[in-house]
């Protein structure tokens, strides 16, 4: 007969001389975690010795120093750059473990209005509820990840049922010093940050959902992009009303990106048009077709030389754009892919 982990734990604990009271406390603690389908972690030593074997020498140190991250910038689709903090491999492994073994086990806590970084949801599912609206409000959360402090992350792990030292250690692994808020916060680039950000925006989502329900509006959020829409001819809420709720939850709106659009103007949600269906913007599709045309007519190398681009990078960049179009509009994307495959990339 196979023995349960409880019986093995009790036997080992008694051999180590622990009291009945201590053993029962441990079993009660473990039952809360197992009920939520979470790994049982009694203390930091247990985590490092049992779950993170082989990463023990580095796990505690690398989450405390700046050299544990490589900082770089990527160009945004609009103006400016996005700063990325990529963890070194050891720290990244630990963060992936937290992501897969803890965070993904409680993803059902997220509302159906949340579409970013959730399996089977996307910018397309985020845009779909807003199709054929009379008006749309777009609001962007400023410095989203930097706004989520280690204290909030610590409280989240405590709420899951983990004891103090384990929660503090996990929150250290998932945060770093922010040059925006001058405190430890979620780094943009850590595997754990997207889901943690979602969990720590749940209360904001609840209040915004309540507002939407009261005023017969639609609400969705994709990461830091908040969208409201409705079928009423007149919008029943102002951006300021929404921004006030955002401030109450410790976030800040990026006012330069706040937009309210009415039917007849171009209505967009997370980069997609939603006038009479979800579509890739016409300008985007035209640019892809233009690049395909010149690459096929003059050859990729000549075209890249003219636009001062590297051929290898250009090929991947163009294919990425085609696959994006295909993910939203399969027919249009497939036609683009056929042209792409007809180009002589050896030229």
Identify the residue ranges that each predicted region occupies.
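Right-hand nucleic-acid polymerase module
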Residues: 1-75, 81-165, 172-190, 199-206, ...
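Catalytic palm active-site di-aspartate
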Residues: 138-142, 189, 193, 215-230
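Alpha-helix N-cap/helix-initiation sites
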Residues: 164-167, 219
């Amino acid at each position: 007969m196979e023995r349960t982990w409880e019986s093995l734990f009790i036997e080992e604990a008694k051999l180590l001389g622990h009291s009945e009271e201590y053993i029962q406390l441990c079993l009660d603690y473990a039952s809360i975690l197992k009920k939520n389908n979470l790994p049982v972690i009694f203390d930091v030593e247990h985590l490092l010795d049992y779950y993170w074997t082989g990463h023990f020498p580095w796990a505690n140190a690398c989450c405390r120093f700046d050299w544990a991250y490589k900082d770089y910038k990527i160009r945004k689709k609009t103006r400016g750059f996005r700063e990325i903090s990529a963890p070194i491999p050891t720290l990244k492994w630990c963060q992936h473990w937290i992501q897969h073994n803890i965070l993904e086990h409680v993803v059902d806590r997220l509302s159906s209005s949340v579409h970013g970084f959730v399996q089977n949801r996307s910018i397309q599912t985020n845009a779909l509820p807003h199709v054929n609206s009379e008006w749309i409000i777009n609001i962007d959360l400023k410095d989203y990840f930097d706004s989520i402090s280690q204290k909030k992350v610590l409280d989240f792990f405590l709420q899951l049922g983990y004891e103090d030292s384990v929660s503090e250690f996990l929150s250290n692994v998932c945060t770093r010093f922010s040059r925006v808020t001058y405190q430890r916060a979620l780094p943009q680039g850590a595997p754990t940050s997207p889901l943690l950000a979602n969990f720590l925006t749940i209360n904001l989502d609840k209040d915004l959902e309540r507002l939407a329900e009261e005023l017969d509006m639609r609400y969705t959020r994709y990461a830091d992009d908040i969208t409201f829409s409705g079928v009423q001819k007149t919008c029943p809420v102002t951006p300021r009303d929404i921004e006030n709720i955002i401030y109450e939850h410790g976030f800040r709106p990026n006012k330069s990106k706040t937009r309210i659009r009415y039917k007849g103007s171009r209505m967009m949600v997370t980069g997609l048009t939603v006038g009479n269906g979800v579509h890739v913007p016409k300008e985007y599709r035209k640019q892809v077709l233009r690049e395909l045309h010149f690459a096929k007519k003059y050859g990729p190398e000549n075209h890249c030389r003219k636009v001062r681009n590297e051929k290898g990078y250009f090929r991947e960049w163009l294919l990425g754009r085609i696959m994006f179009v295909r993910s939203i509009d399969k027919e249009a994307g497939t036609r683009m892919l056929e042209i792409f495959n007809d180009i002589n990339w050896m030229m």
